[in-house]
Each structure stands twice: as structure tokens, then as C-alpha cells.
Amino acid sequence: MLIELRSRSVILSALAFAVLALTIFFFAWDPTAVASIDLAPGVLWVIFTFSGLLGLHRSFGVEQPTRAMDALLAAPIDREAIYLGKLIANLGFVILVQAVSLPAVALLYNVQVGAYVWPLIGVVLLAAIGLVSVGTLFASMAVSTRLAELLLPLLALPFFVPVILPAAQATARLMSGRAVSEVSGYISILAAFDVVFLVVCTLLYPYTLEQ
């Protein structure tokens, strides 16, 4: 976290990717072929997913030259506490990217989010917890390999799917003006996966450090 506060490399790289992806999607969009309300949810979750992966990879990569993880392992700290600390730090980065991307998508695609902004924020935050829980575990496994940039998406994306699908469905319905009661099932699924991923990844993390 201190390294990131000094360099801001993780935040800047993730934000740069989000802005670039948003720009490409916007200029490739033909409003006569696809309605903005149909496109915006997909664009939003593509940006969240891949900017999050980039941020997760960078958050571990910047620590490699200083051997910060070795220092943590030598300290009298529970391995689970190390995981939770990394998770909270990564969650902060992901939420920051989401806080920039969500208004940008709403503005560019002319989506009115005022009426359902709080349920939408709840969906986004629940999904962020699930994605970061899994991503932090796999990023710690992949960072020390020579193909970390390739290995992290291969490991993490299959486990992202159970989180992204209900989140995208809930986002699409909320942006279409549906009632919050229509997305309560998706919210319950997100909450359930968050609990499962958080507990399982916390228990598995100490074993990944021993490899």
C-alpha cells in the first residue's frame, strides 16, 4: 500500500486502461444499430473486469523488486491477515476505478442512473468484493511466475464468471428502469458467492505462500 501511495502505478495503469477501453467502445458504437441502454451494462463490466485484472497484477508486481512479501512472511503475522490486508488494498483500487468508470459510462451513453443509483452501487460493490477475493488469491500465485500476465487471467476469469453474470444482469435491469425487487435474486447470488469466495480464499491463501 505504501509503495502504491508513493508511485500510484497501480491506480494510474488501471484508470488508463479503463479510459482507453471506454473511448474505444464509444467510438466503435453505432447508435442506430444498438441502443445505448443495451450496450452500456456490457461495456461497464468489461471495463471493470479487465481493469481489475490489470490492477491486481500490478499490485503484486510492484512489490517484487523490493521483496516486500518476503518481509511480511518473516514478520509474526498470520497469513490470513496478509491476505485480508491485500484484499482491502486491492478493493480500494477497484472501487476507485469503478467510481470513475460508472459516471463516465452513464455520461457517454446517456444513461440516467439517478433513480437507481444506490441499488446499482450496491451491485457494483458486491461484485467488486467477489472479484477481488478471487483475484487476490490468484494474483499472489501467478506473480512469481514468468508468465504472470497470461496466467492470472487464465486462472481468475473462470471464477469471475459466477460474479460477473448476475452483476451484469442486475445492472442491465436497473439501467432499464426495472424495480429493485426484480434484481433481488441476483443480489442474493452475488452475496452468496462473496461469502463463499472470501472464506475459501482466506483459508487457501497460506498454502499458496508455501509454494
Regions found by a protein language model. Give the residues of each.
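Aromatic- and glycine-rich beta-strand/loop motifs that create alpha-glucan
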Residues: 1-14
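Transmembrane helix boundary and interhelical loop/hinge segments in multi-pass membrane proteins
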Residues: 4, 53-73, 87
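Transmembrane helix segments
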Residues: 27, 138-182, 186-189, 195, ...
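Membrane-interfacial helix-loop-helix connectors in multipass membrane proteins
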Residues: 28-39, 103-125, 171-187, 208
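Long, hydrophobic alpha-helical segments
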Residues: 40-56
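Selective transmembrane-helix segments that form parts of the transport pathway or gating/packing helices
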Residues: 77-106
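A structural motif at transmembrane helix-loop-helix junctions in multipass membrane proteins
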Residues: 113, 123-157, 209-211
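Junction motif at the cytosolic side of a transmembrane helix
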Residues: 194-211
